[in-house]
Amino acid sequence: MYRNWTELIKPHTIELGGDETEIQRKATLVAEPLERGFGTTLGNALRRVLLSSLQGAAVSTVRIEGVLHEFSSVPGVIEDVTDIILNIKGLALRMESTGIKNIYLRVDKEGPVTAGMIECETGIEILNPDHHIATLNKSGTLDITMTVTTGKGYVRAQLNREDESYAIGDIPIDASYNPVKKVAYRVENARVGQQTDYDKLIMDIETNGVVTPEDALALAAKILQDQLNPFINFDDVPTAHDHEMEDRPQWNPNLFRKVDELELSVRSANCLKNDDIVYIGDLVQKSESEMLKTPNFGRKSLNEIKEVLDEMGLSLGMTLDTWPPENIDDLSKQFEEENF
């Protein structure tokens, strides 16, 4: 039964890429190799969770001095209340605890009003202090009390209005708690050995800075894992086969391939054959200087072999303890069946 999941190929690492100056908000994450079809399966599931289920903080209610409803204007303020509320929705807030807290904006100075002018209670941080809220003229004043709550997804103003703490003068607003702003994924081909029909999952994630794209993806994966656990009706008990696999040295399976399987030029292939190099494991233990001493083996052949090895995650000059294994022929066949 264990073969249903243990023999599926899994990603080696999750690579993180993107502009270094924006990587806290925008990043591209690449997972490869994946079994054919798993790129779309995982990509779609992760995208849906990223856009719907992550917890965050947002303003759910505002109270503006002298204003009773959102279809009003504030004397001395260029923007009307609707525009001010739209700008407030764009605040990127980090709150250490759950519950309800308040933040305050009190300004009586002419000019632009930004998020950095907001006074926060302990445990609340505004991550976009340059975000525009409103613009005051000479006679303008602005006094706003904002209620910050925690939640997930998108909650409409009507639901916030039904809250027991709602009072006359409070203006409930739509609250977007999710720190993830955009997610897109695509699937490309990945190569494992000579096979090129595996999947590479590429995800472009943009957040508001409250969490990094890498952490957001990790949280989404954990949510999926936690939701799927109840469907598993057996214990993952180690078997004799599992212990055998643990005791086996963790070789790169390409080491057990024969060098004549590589798509090398005739000159390079003949040089390796004449030097009695049978397996790739034999080849990688050779240094560059040793290879160049091989008759008829030049710099061009060396570069060709280095390029082929690099595609496998290998290189010349490696040290392989206990190589070659006593049963190398059997292991070669076994690794070929399991990985190729």
From Swiss-Prot:
<dbReference type="InterPro" id="IPR011773">
    <property type="entry name" value="DNA-dir_RpoA"/>
</dbReference>
<dbReference type="InterPro" id="IPR011262">
    <property type="entry name" value="DNA-dir_RNA_pol_insert"/>
</dbReference>
<keyword id="KW-0240">DNA-directed RNA polymerase</keyword>
<dbReference type="GO" id="GO:0006351">
    <property type="term" value="P:DNA-templated transcription"/>
</dbReference>
<comment type="subunit">
    <text>Homodimer. The RNAP catalytic core consists of 2 alpha, 1 beta, 1 beta' and 1 omega subunit. When a sigma factor is associated with the core the holoenzyme is formed, which can initiate transcription.</text>
</comment>
<keyword id="KW-0548">Nucleotidyltransferase</keyword>
<dbReference type="GO" id="GO:0046983">
    <property type="term" value="F:protein dimerization activity"/>
</dbReference>
<dbReference type="GO" id="GO:0005737">
    <property type="term" value="C:cytoplasm"/>
</dbReference>
<feature type="region of interest" description="Alpha N-terminal domain (alpha-NTD)">
    <location>
        <begin position="1"/>
        <end position="235"/>
    </location>
</feature>
<keyword id="KW-0808">Transferase</keyword>
<dbReference type="InterPro" id="IPR011260">
    <property type="entry name" value="RNAP_asu_C"/>
</dbReference>
<dbReference type="Pfam" id="PF01000">
    <property type="entry name" value="RNA_pol_A_bac"/>
</dbReference>
<feature type="region of interest" description="Alpha C-terminal domain (alpha-CTD)">
    <location>
        <begin position="251"/>
        <end position="340"/>
    </location>
</feature>
<dbReference type="InterPro" id="IPR011263">
    <property type="entry name" value="DNA-dir_RNA_pol_RpoA/D/Rpb3"/>
</dbReference>
<dbReference type="Pfam" id="PF01193">
    <property type="entry name" value="RNA_pol_L"/>
</dbReference>
<dbReference type="Pfam" id="PF03118">
    <property type="entry name" value="RNA_pol_A_CTD"/>
</dbReference>
<dbReference type="GO" id="GO:0003677">
    <property type="term" value="F:DNA binding"/>
</dbReference>
<dbReference type="InterPro" id="IPR036643">
    <property type="entry name" value="RNApol_insert_sf"/>
</dbReference>
<protein>
    <recommendedName>
        <fullName>DNA-directed RNA polymerase subunit alpha</fullName>
        <ecNumber>2.7.7.6</ecNumber>
    </recommendedName>
</protein>
<dbReference type="InterPro" id="IPR036603">
    <property type="entry name" value="RBP11-like"/>
</dbReference>
<dbReference type="GO" id="GO:0000428">
    <property type="term" value="C:DNA-directed RNA polymerase complex"/>
</dbReference>
<dbReference type="GO" id="GO:0003899">
    <property type="term" value="F:DNA-directed RNA polymerase activity"/>
</dbReference>
<comment type="similarity">
    <text>Belongs to the RNA polymerase alpha chain family.</text>
</comment>
<comment type="function">
    <text>DNA-dependent RNA polymerase catalyzes the transcription of DNA into RNA using the four ribonucleoside triphosphates as substrates.</text>
</comment>
<keyword id="KW-0804">Transcription</keyword>
